[in-house]
């Protein structure tokens, strides 16, 4: 990684829209990464799990994160830690701005995980 690649300005980089209602910009290191996530109200993440942990910090909005029957409603200045191999899903109950920290994830760095956020039944975000 070059020194010039180490600074990220979220005001200059709005991120990439993966599907309608979900955009993400990423700051990528060699072993860790951080995502600046914007979700429109009603945006979903389908149930899934992965072999790394993830920490979500909500800057603004209201994000419902579900672990089976256990539910966390995250609002501004609240976080949740998602352990490895724990199935989870989510719904934005209001427009959300959040920061997600995780291990390096090639599918995020290359914007190849859009299918997690796509509702094939409607071809739009579930509401």
Annotate each predicted stretch with a short phrase.
Residues 69-84:
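Short acidic-glycine-tyrosine-enriched beta hairpin
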Residues 19-20, 35-49:
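Conserved short histidine dyad/triad with adjacent acidic residue
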């Amino acid at each position: 990684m070059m020194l010039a690649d180490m600074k990220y300005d979220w005001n200059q980089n709005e991120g990439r829209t993966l599907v309608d209602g979900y955009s993400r910009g990423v700051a990528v290191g060699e072993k860790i990464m951080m995502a600046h996530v914007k979700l429109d109200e009603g945006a979903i993440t389908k149930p899934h799990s992965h072999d790394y942990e993830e920490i979500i910090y909500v800057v603004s909005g209201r994000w419902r994160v579900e672990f089976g029957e256990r539910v966390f409603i995250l609002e501004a200045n609240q976080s949740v830690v998602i352990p490895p191999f724990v199935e989870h899903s989510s719904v934005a109950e209001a427009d959300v701005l959040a920061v997600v920290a995780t291990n390096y994830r090639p599918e995020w760095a290359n914007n190849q995980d859009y299918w997690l956020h796509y509702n094939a039944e409607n071809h739009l975000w579930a509401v």
